[in-house]
Amino acid sequence: TVGGVWAKLDVGIENAAELDGAGKWQTFRFITFPMLRGATTSAAVLVFLYCVTSFGIILLLGAGKVSSIETEIYFSLTQFLDFKTASAYALVQTVITVLAFAISKRIGNGEAGVETPTEIETSSGLNRREWPVVVVSVIFVIGVLVLPILNLLAKFTWAGFQSLSGNGQRGLLNISVWQATGNSLRNIVIAAGLALLIGILVSWLLSRSKRSWLEIPFLLPMGISSVVLGFGYLLSIRAGWLTVPLVQALLATPLVIRIVHPALVSLGTDYRDVAVTAGANGWQIWRLVEAPMLSSVLRSAAVFAALVSLGEFGAASLLSYGDQATLPVVLYQLIGRPGPENYSMAMAACAMLIVFVFAISMTSALVQTRRRSS
C-alpha cells in the first residue's frame, strides 16, 4: 500500500525542497509523509486487522496462557460446543472489522497503490545517509524471518521425510502428510482460481464506477478472520471438502481486489475511449488491451491468492474433517502431540511447506524477470 503510492509521488517536489536547503528528514517530514498519510493510515488499519484476527500464532505460541477473540471462538466450538458464545465473539470481531474499515475510509480515504512495470523508475542508488536504515531493515528481516526458517530447515531429517507417508506416532493422523498435501494443492487450484475470477470482475466493475464505497463490502473478508468465516460456513453449509477452498477464495478475493483495482485505475481511460471509438466492447477491451497491460499484476494477484490458500489454517481447522485435512492442519496436529516421530514429521512438513511457498513465489518472479529482459 505505502510502497505503491510512494512510487507514484512526483520526485521533482522532493528535489526542489532539497535544492532550497531542506535535509532528507525535513523533506520526508513536511513533504513526503503528508502525501503518504492516507496510504499510511490504510496500511496501519490493515496491520491492525491482521493482528486482531491472528489465530494460528496465538494458538501455537500462546500455549493456553494468551488468548484472543479467534482462539475463544475456536475453543468454544471445539471443546464446549457453545455456539451462542462463539456467535457473540464472532459478532464482536465483525464490529471491530467494520469500525476499522470505516476509520480507514474516513481518515485514509482508502488510498492504495500498486507498482506496475511501467511505473518503476531506475534509482540513482543509495547514499551514505540512507545505508543505516537499510542495514537496520535487513537485520530486522533476518532476525524475525530468515533465522527461524533456517532453524526449521536445520532440524529437517531424512527419517522424518520418509515418515510422511505414515500416520504419525500411535496413529495420530487420520491421513498421511502426503494426502494432506494433495488436499492443499487441490484447494489452491480452486481457491486461487475463484479468487482471481471474482477479484478481477469486481475490480473491473469498481474501476468503471465513481462510488468508492462499493469497495467496502468486497474488502470486509480481509478483516473478518478465517475462524469467523469458517464458523459461518459450519452453521450454514455444514461439512464438505468444497467449503474449505470456498472460504479460502473468500479470504483471498480482497487481496486480489487490492492489487488489481488500483492498477486498473492507474491505466486511465484514454485507451478505453480509443477502443470504444474503434468499436470494441467491454470484453474485447479487457482481453486485448487491459489484460496484456496488467499481466504482471494479475500474476502477482494469483500468487498471493495461492499463498493465502496454502497457509490458511483457521477455517480449515473447523471445516476439514477426516481425510480432507490440509497440510497446516496436519502440521498443527503433529506439533501438538509429543513423540520423536511426530516431531521429526512436523519438521519435515514445515520444510515442505517452506519449499512450496518459495517455489510459488520464485516461479512468478522468474516469469516476470524473463518478460522484462525480453
Model-identified regions with their sequence ranges:
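Membrane-embedded alpha-helices of multi-pass transport/permease systems
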Residues: 1-13, 52-56, 103, 146-150, ...
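Transmembrane alpha-helices
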Residues: 1-6, 10-11, 24-53, 135-143, ...
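C-terminal transmembrane helix and the adjacent membrane-cytosol boundary/short C-terminal tail
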Residues: 3-14, 18, 25-26, 57, ...
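Cytoplasmic-entry segments and transmembrane alpha-helices of multi-pass inner-membrane transporters
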Residues: 14, 38, 126-136, 201-233, ...
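Membrane-interfacial helix termini and adjacent extracytoplasmic/periplasmic loops
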Residues: 25, 58-65, 119-121, 166, ...
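Hydrophobic positions within alpha-helical transmembrane segments of bacterial inner-membrane proteins
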Residues: 39-55, 98, 102, 188, ...
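Interhelical loop and adjacent transmembrane-helix boundary motif
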Residues: 58-98, 155-175, 310, 316-366
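N-terminal signal-anchor/first transmembrane alpha helix
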Residues: 94, 98-101, 123-151, 212-218
